[in-house]
Amino acid sequence: MFLLHILAIGACLLWYFVRSDKRKQGSNIPTIRRWPALFPEFLDRLSYNSCAARLVENGYREHKDRPFRLLKMDMDLVVIPLKYAQEMRALTSDELDPLTAVFDDNVGKVTGILLDSQLHTHAIQRRLTPRLPNIIPAMMDELNYAFQQVIPSEAGERLQTSWVPINPYDMVLELSTRAAARLFVGEPICRDEVFLKTSAAYSRNIFDTIHVSRSLGHIITPYLGSLIPSVRQFHQQFEYIQNLVLGEIAHRKQHSEDNKADDFLQWCMELARTKEESTPTALAQRTVGILSMAVVHTSAMATTHLLFDMISNQELREQLRTEQKQVLKQGWMGITQQTMLDMKQLDSVMRESQRINPVGEFTFRRIVRKPITLSDGFQLHPGQQIAIAARCINTDGDVLPDAETFKPMRWMEKESAASTGFAHSSDSNLHFGLGRYACPGRFLASYMIKAIISRVLFDYEFKLQDDSAAGRPPNLIHGDKIFPSRDVTVLFRRRHDE
C-alpha cells in the first residue's frame, strides 16, 4: 500500500501540472483549503479524503449562500447553495448530466458502474414502482426464507434462550441481497447460494475498491488493479455473476413465448431501445450494477444505521414494537403496501436516521454539459462537477429547529405526512436527490428497510456485545462518504412475549 501511495503522489503531481490551466474556469469561486495558500493545491487533493467532512462544514459555514470549491484527487467539486436547487432541478440531462457524475463518484473506470443510459431508471419508474403492491408479497416471501438461511438453525436454537453474537451489517447485507435478487433476477438464481454469497462479496469489494480509489485517485487506480486485492476479487466475482445472468438471458430469449418473468432483468430486456442497451452483456452489467450498488448496499447501510440508532434506546424500540403490533394484526407476513404506509413512527425514525447519518455529504451530483447562467448571474461552465451539501443543510439549525439533536419522532410532528415521509424528496430531505432524477428506487428501498426492521423488532431483542459500551457505534468516515461500522458485533436473542 505504501508503494501505491507513492505512485499516487507522483501521478497527482503530473496531473496537477498538466491540468492546472484547465481549471481556470470558475476561479472566482472561493476555494476551501486545508493547507495555507503558500502551499501548492495538490497537497489539498492528496489530503481531501482525510478531512473532507471538516472542509465541507467550513465551506458551508463560511459560504452558505454562495458556491465554494473543494479540491479532490480527480477533479474540483463546486458545492452550490440550496437557493439554486429549484432552478436547477428542472434542467435536463443534456445540461446537467447525472449519469457521468454517478459514474465518476463510483469510480466507473475501475468498477464499470454505472451505465451509459437511463434504461435502469425507466425500468424502475415504469415497471417496478407501479407494481410495488404486487411485488411486496414476493419480497416478503423471500425475506421470510432469507431470515431462515441467514440465521442458521443452530444459532436459531441458541437464540431461544441465549444471546448470540451477530455482525448486523453482514446480516442485513445478506438479507437485502436475497430479497433484491428475487425482484431483480428471479428464481432460480435468487436461491443459488453461490450466486448469493458471490453477490454479497461483490458488493463489499466494490465499496472497498471505491474506498481505495478515492485515496489513490481515479487517474492511476485503473492501472493498478492487479495490485489491489478488492479489484482482483470483484472482477472475478463479476465474471461469475455476469455469466450466470447471461445464461438466464439466453434462456428467456429461447422461451420468449412461455410465461414471462416479472423482474428487473425482464423489464430491461423489454424496455431496451437501442442496440447497445439490448446486448446481453449490457443487460447483465446493468442488472448486476444496479442490484449491487443502488439497491443492496445502500439499503444495507441505511438499515444498519437504523439498527445502531435504536440500539441504545430501549424506549424507542418498545414504542416501535407497539406500532408494529397495532399495524400488523395478522403478523409480519401480513405486510402489504398499506401497512407499510401505516408504519408512520418507523417512517419518521428512518427519515431522522438518514438525516443524521446519510450515506454521504452530498446530493445532486452533476456534470455541467452546457454553459448555464442562473437568475443571479452566477455561471456554470461545461466540465464542472457540482453538488449540494445535503448533510450540512439538513443539520443546519437555521433550516431545521434543533437540527443537531436526533429526534426519532420529529417527522410525526409535521402536519403533512406525505411531504415528510422517508421516501419523499424535498429541500428538507435531500439525500435521495432532487427533481426528475431523484433516486427512482427510493420507494422499494423504503419498503425493504421497513420489512427487515419490522421482523427484527417482532422477533428479537438486541444489544451491543460489550455491556459497558454506551451510545451509538461511531460511523466510519472516508472522504465525503459516511458508513456504519462494519465490525461491530451485536447480541441477538429471540423475544418471547408474555
UniProtKB/Swiss-Prot annotation:
Query: Alphabetically, which GO biological process terms does the record hold?
Result: secondary metabolic process
Which pathway does the UniProt entry assign to this protein? Secondary metabolite biosynthesis
Give the protein's cofactors.
heme
What start and end residues bound the annotated signal peptide? 1-20
Q: Where does heme bind?
A: C439
Keyword Cytoplasm included in the entry's annotation: no
Molecular function (GO) terms for this protein are: heme binding; iron ion binding; monooxygenase activity; oxidoreductase activity, acting on paired donors, with incorporation or reduction of molecular oxygen
Q: Which domain of life is it from?
A: Eukaryota
PANTHER family from the entry? CYTOCHROME P450, P450, PUTATIVE (EUROFUNG)-RELATED
Give the family from UniProt: Belongs to the cytochrome P450 family.
Summarizing the function annotation, the protein's role is: Cytochrome P450 monooxygenase; part of the gene cluster that mediates the biosynthesis of paspalitrems, indole-diterpene (IDT) mycotoxins that are potent tremorgens in mammals. The geranylgeranyl diphosphate (GGPP) synthase idtG is proposed to catalyze the first step in IDT biosynthesis via catalysis of a series of iterative condensations of isopentenyl diphosphate (IPP) with dimethylallyl diphosphate (DMAPP), geranyl diphosphate (GPP), and farnesyl diphosphate (FPP), to form GGPP.
| Name of this chain's protein | Cytochrome P450 monooxygenase idtP
Organism, as annotated: Claviceps paspali
Q: Which gene encodes it?
A: idtP
